[in-house]
């Protein structure tokens, strides 16, 4: 099934929207979608909104305003999930450079990354202190290492920095071994840094 994002046909004039007047959570949602690329309502309910119902209501409003576009995903079990991403016009209106990428495999990969972060958030609420998406990780580790995400965790017993690599079975084993070796060298001597593949 292909992923086709569509803007709302019922949206009002985007130029009349003052994004500074949006609710704080709505602006946080737009920032997260810009940085992560794409997310579902369930994921956004875990990361930003207080409930799934609120997430669906707020996402629909942002979609109607022309700030978001959405696409149905292949159902995994009952119901058809919907993925959201910021529109080209929405990016421009918010002062962002449009960096969206398409393709079914890229959308699935991005949703899996967001799922991993959501699992960390759900497993220990309040422990995720920082989440850097792939574009934000540039320059943190050596040039040959660019994790899908870096997550900083803080618990009573200590803290950790987790480099997330989501494998979609698109790389051959020699490439994976080379990347694991590069991570081993890059993380050597960095106490508290871990790789989750």
Give the location of each predicted region.
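A broadly conserved amphipathic alpha-helix scaffold signal in soluble, globular proteins
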Residues: 60, 114-121
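Catalytic cores of nucleic-acid endonucleases
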Residues: 168-197
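Short, well-ordered alpha-helices that flank and scaffold nucleotide-derived cofactor binding pockets
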Residues: 46, 118, 122, 185
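A short, highly charged nucleic-acid-interacting micro-segment common to nuclease
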Residues: 97-113
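Nuclease-adjacent, charged terminal/linker segments that flank catalytic cores
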Residues: 1-101
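Active-site metal-binding core of divalent-cation-utilizing nuclease and nuclease-like domains
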Residues: 71, 106, 118-162, 168-178
